[in-house]
Amino acid sequence: MLGLSSFFSGQDEKKYPYTVYLSCNETLQGFLSKQVFDSVIQYPLCAKDSLKQTYQVQSFDMTYAERGLYQDSSGLPIVFTDYSQAQFTGNQFSPQWIRSFRERSYRGDTVYIENVKVLGPDNKSHACKGLKVIIR
């Protein structure tokens, strides 16, 4: 039973030396209004260390969880989530995804930015803590 308690305590959570941010702004995470999300999604991502030094993002993966209202077989409404994934080289979303977010994103949708690679001060690629944004 002791093994399970340490599993759920979060002690084994990986520590990252860098954290990724939208538009290099530390306040743009968690819940964002659609208006704010649409305005910052066009800007590059950046990463920062614990000393707030900025580093260049080399690549990242994105998962977009788009919630929609559908009808089940008996005509009752149900909320269903469609998942889209993309990989990006560099520090920006593609123009197609920026346009898609602006046209399709809605309250309750979630964007996950994961598997972020950062160019560190040693000119080597490092893993970076990802980001989760929920549109409200």
Regions found by a protein language model. Name each.
Residues M1-K15:
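Bacterial Sec-dependent N-terminal signal peptides
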Residues D12-R136:
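Beta-strand/loop-dominated core regions that host nucleotide or nucleotide-derived cofactor-binding catalytic loops
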